[in-house]
Amino acid sequence: MFNMNLLSTPSSEEGSPQNRSSSMSSVEGKKDRDTFTNLQNEFDGKVFGVSLEESLKVAQEEVIIQKSTNEIGSIPVVIAKSGKYLKENALDTTGIFRIAGSNKRVRELQAVFSKPPDYGRKFEGWCDFNVHDIATLLKRYLNSLSEPLVPLALYDIFRNPILENPKINEHKEQIIKDYEDIYMLLPQQNRHLILYLAALLNLFARNEKKNLMSASNLAAIVQPSLLSHPKDEMCPKEYEASRTVIEFLILHASDIIPNTEKANKDTMPHAGTVAKFNNITVPEMAIDSDEEDFVHPSIDDHMLPRSRALSDSNNFTIHHHHHHHHALFPSPIDFDNNGLSVPRSFKGRTLSAESLSPRLSKLLGNVGNSSNTGIKDPTERVPRGEHKTKHKQRQSWLRRLTSPSRTQP
């Protein structure tokens, strides 16, 4: 039986930010999930309901993506602003990201971050909203993206390190190394947003004893927006595998350093030095520089497709990283009709499949084989209408899976 009992969304009373029930009716849950689909015409369609690339064209903000490297990158304004507020005000809030906000207030926030010319960059009126409204806004943006953050062409490759190593803890270091390679196959803007979200959610996982939101619970909430594919939408086993991947990325947010960033980590000046000489302000980061890094709890004997969570709140260790700034690079692999086979030169370096780990090189060599990946065209994108239809089907499946009759022991 899958451990899905925390996926159901508790209710919220629209008129009272302070009085939240811990359980949500299926009618209210469906209303919240379908809000964007039903009301998308109220907004200009430049921030919500478009691709990440299109959204960044009108509303992006620079942030420090990873504490361990002080990598600076651009993410959507709505994610940067809501993430910053939640980090400062909601780390100890019970059920954060699980409890739904008020549809009315979330729509108001959505309108703010959809309105030109600043698209919410100057917004400071958080006092009229509560943390559940703001967390729901962040989720709504992710759920409205026209494609998951891991492109469909990389879906199988991105899951492979976990699927090949069912006993995750025994192969933890190798899995981390594989993801350091695989991250570099992502488009730069997708990589930056996933890294930021993993670091942000890592903070909430660290406070699981207070907010009751483990890395497993958080991964289940964001997984459909980060790592999903139409061919696996209605398969519980595949859903669980993808959730486990996202959980691993959250738990190891400070350990996984994409390879180009690692290569430049020891040669570039500290972010503060860059700010001093370039007269810039170092932007908000997901994890403050004075906070300790969270190292994942023990995950011994975790086996797929079993649903046992990776996290164990009774086993924590802490370590520290030195902070460096480094250059930014685009995704080194181009997409063409024959697969991921065209190396891209960047900053004087070329990253080819052969320069990656042997396992990843083998995967790249087979990515064009539809029998291996299930993808006929590696550049395929799910049409927006089909994506929304699949999203509704997935939510219907989740409601059935998390119904009281399915979740009771």
UniProtKB/Swiss-Prot annotation:
Bias type Basic and acidic residues, positions: 377-386
GO MF term (any one): GTPase activator activity
InterPro entries: Rho_GTPase_activation_prot, RhoGAP, RhoGAP_dom
GO BP field: negative regulation of Rho protein signal transduction; regulation of fungal-type cell wall organization; signal transduction
Gene3D superfamilies (UniProt xref): Rho GTPase activation protein
GO CC term (a single one): cell cortex
Residue span of region Disordered: 1-32, 362-409
Family annotation (Pfam families): RhoGAP
Chain ranges passing through the membrane: none
Protein name: Rho-GTPase-activating protein BAG7
Composition-biased stretches (Polar residues): 1-26
Rho-GAP domain: residues covered: 50-257
Function: Acts in signal transduction. Activates RHO1.
Subunit structure: Interacts with RHO1.
Keywords, in A-Z order: GTPase activation
Residues under site feature: Arginine finger: R98
